[in-house]
């Protein structure tokens, strides 16, 4: 899918999820989340072509303009909505599925490593499709959050969360088991 189509999808996703988003033009001109996703697409393309320094510069400019820090190596799905995005941090090896929703202050980070050798490989979370992450939530390490799960505001997730579950608390515990099929 080309970038203009992705941008249109991003804008439409914000309009569907944010009752304060009145028009596509307003979202395009004023949404830090949409802006950060656009910058990330450029940075990620540069990263994949191994223009690492330029990718990091683009990523830094995005953070400066939007307050949202997305590492250029992160993999983001379609129609991600970052609502009130100030302070959102998404690490290098994070993977985010389609149709996810993040509120402000969300961190997809790595755990503290004992040595540099431990920093090689997968260090950040993987989120399935349709995951909602509440304000101030922190998800650390190479954990998996299943499709349709919700991470409550201010929760700290250190273990895998099954699909459809609600994770709540510090450290987060599953409060609602996934629905039986």
Please name every model-derived segment.
Residues 25, 29, 60-61, 94, ...:
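Residue-level signal for alpha-helical context at structural boundaries
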Residues 32-33, 38-41, 74, 80, ...:
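Solvent-exposed, flexible loop/coil residues
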Residues 66, 71-72, 77-78, 83-92, ...:
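Left-handed beta-helix
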């Amino acid at each position: 899918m080309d970038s203009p189509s992705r941008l249109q999808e991003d804008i439409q996703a914000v309009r569907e999820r944010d009752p304060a988003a009145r028009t596509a033009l307003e979202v395009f001109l004023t949404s830090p989340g949409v802006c950060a996703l656009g910058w990330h697409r450029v940075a990620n393309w540069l990263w994949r072509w191994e223009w690492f320094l330029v990718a990091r510069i683009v990523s830094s400019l995005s953070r400066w303009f939007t307050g949202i820090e997305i590492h250029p190596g992160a993999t983001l799905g379609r129609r991600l909505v970052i609502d009130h995005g100030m302070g959102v941090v998404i690490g290098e090896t994070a993977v985010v599925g389609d149709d996810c929703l993040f509120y402000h202050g969300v961190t997809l980070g790595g755990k503290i490593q004992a040595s540099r050798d431990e920093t090689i490989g997968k260090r950040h979370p993987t989120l399935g499709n349709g995951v909602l992450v509440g304000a101030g939530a922190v998800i650390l390490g190479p954990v998996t959050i299943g499709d349709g799960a919700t991470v409550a505001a201010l929760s700290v997730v250190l273990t895998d969360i099954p699909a459809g579950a609600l994770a709540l608390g510090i450290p987060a515990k599953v409060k609602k088991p996934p629905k039986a099929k």
